Swiss-Prot record:
Topological domain ranges for the Cytoplasmic compartment: 39-424
Gene designation: Pag1
Lineage: Eukaryota, Metazoa, Chordata, Craniata, Vertebrata
Transmembrane segments: 18-38
Tissue expression pattern: Ubiquitously expressed, with highest levels in developing brain, lung, thymus, spleen and testis. Present in mast cells.
Entry protein name: Phosphoprotein associated with glycosphingolipid-enriched microdomains 1
Amino acid sequence: MGPAGSALSSGQMQMQMVLWGSLAAVAMFFLITFLILLCSSCDRDKKPRQHSGDHESLMNVPSDKEMFSHSATSLTTDALASSEQNGVLTNGDILSEDSTMTCMQHYEEVQTSASDLLDSQDSTGKAKCHQSRELPRIPPENAVDAMLTARAADGDSGPGVEGPYEVLKDSSSQENMVEDCLYETVKEIKEVADKSQGGKSKSTSALKELQGAHAEGKADFAEYASVDRNKKCRHSTNAESILGTSSDLDEETPPPVPVKLLDENANLPEKGEHGAEEQAPEAPSGHSKRFSSLSYKSREEDPTLTEEEISAMYSSVNKPGQSAHKPGPESTCQCPQGPPQRSSSSCNDLYATVKDFEKTPNSISMLPPARRPGEEPEPDYEAIQTLNREDDKVPLGTNGHLVPKENDYESIGDLQQGRDVTRL
């Protein structure tokens, strides 16, 4: 039993050793795989950390716009920024010819002097080179902005204005505003003209009747727009139009024209009779005053008229003189030389001459003694009555037919026909 038992025990020991060896091998395998997984995870963790660090470094590096965003007129250049504009070189950076050319171009742009910048602009502050895009124009919102724009237009740079771009913006906006306000539309001026001529339709109609084509020429002023270079913006134009409408209308409207000139001319015979009733000897002086005033008005309307034409145009008929030269049935004064002189001096009995005017005071002064033996105590009044009666008889001609009523003014055609006769 001894050797058999020892053999069994040795077989069991071998089985145990195989089992423990296999267990150890399996354990070692699992341990190695676990360590490999741990190492791979560590490698994976390290790789994203390196990439994130590179990304953060790239984001912290200033861009090209930030590197060259300083004022263009400053002469100082940043050497450090120009030398380190691309940042620190890393393994992933690739240098090419394009990148080097862009770096050199930026460096040359920084090295330009203020004299070159001033040469690139003309006297008005406008760049000579063509720009690809148009700068925005912001209208002034308050008085401070308006003062700044006016100062920039005059050439005085404000406290916060730097560089050529601000100057270009201000000059272009100012030019556009001035160009917008140079010309006014015809519609606006027609509206103003309608307002000014709304309450004066009667005066304009009388003006057209009296002046004719002259008034029509003045009425056409609303067809063209006026140009005012002193106005700098539409707001100032509107303000001036609102505030100065009354003054402009008063200045533009012509002086009032007397509308009742025709009525006065039609009523002149009645006024002449009343004047003769009050003071008969002073009638020629009153007529001469009236002639001088009318000739003055005609000279204003047409300065080319001469004194002779004006006097011929406004020569009137003295009715007391006509009746005084004609012998009446009730008057005792006989003037045998009156009718032949009148026929020789004028072509008919409707017109009076200078000789008749000169003789009218004598004839009128001779009438009152003729009526003194009468019944009425006022001989002057009776003499004027007889004159009026004789005036009523004047339209009846020698042949018995009616003569058209005479006018106070002679027509130009009759004057031209009878000029040689009246000068005798």
